[in-house]
């Protein structure tokens, strides 16, 4: 981090050097998690018959073309990270990685929560296939935690708003 960020920026993020490095690594690994959804993979796999056949052993990859625009991958990344209980600040950095922060309502509308279904769940998994997609997310998320030096989601830092903005800028420029 010393090479990429001036001391003044690192101070405003308010994480010690090691935790900042771990956090930046984690964000680099999870910011595109929204691409692990039927909404994103379906159209790509339509052009790749061999990988599609392998994936179709686990999922139908069905999606609704007219609904894809409601779950762009940056928004989907934030929604999935929140679904996985990632701290909201870190999830919002992933959601803003193309320079546009997401609104809380838009994020909530994606997958909802334990008490309420989201409006766009069909963009994330075909009917009856939620467990498959959740297991994919969990595996990628756990890998990112491990590779970044965190042993659990509980070790991830809570960020201040200035830290979120600065880390989003770092992620955008990376």
PLM segments and residue spans:
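Accessory nucleic-acid engagement/destabilization modules that flank
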Residues: 1-174
């Amino acid at each position: 981090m010393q090479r990429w960020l001036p001391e003044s920026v690192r101070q405003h993020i308010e994480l010690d050097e090691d935790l900042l490095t771990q956090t930046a690594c984690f964000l680099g690994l999870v910011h595109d998690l929204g691409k692990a959804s039927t909404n994103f993979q379906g159209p790509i796999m339509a052009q790749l018959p061999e990988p599609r056949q392998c994936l179709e052993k686990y999922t139908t990859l069905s999606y609704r073309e007219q609904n894809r625009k409601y779950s762009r991958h940056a928004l989907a990344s934030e929604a999935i990270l929140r679904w996985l209980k990632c701290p909201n600040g870190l999830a919002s950095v992933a959601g803003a990685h193309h320079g546009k922060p997401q609104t809380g309502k838009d994020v909530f509308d994606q997958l909802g929560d334990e008490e309420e279904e989201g409006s766009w769940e069909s963009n994330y998994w075909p009917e009856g296939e939620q467990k498959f997609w959740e297991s994919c997310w969990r595996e990628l998320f756990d890998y990112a935690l491990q590779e970044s030096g965190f042993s659990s989601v509980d070790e991830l830092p809570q960020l201040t708003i200035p830290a979120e903005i600065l880390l989003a800028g770092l992620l955008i420029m990376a």
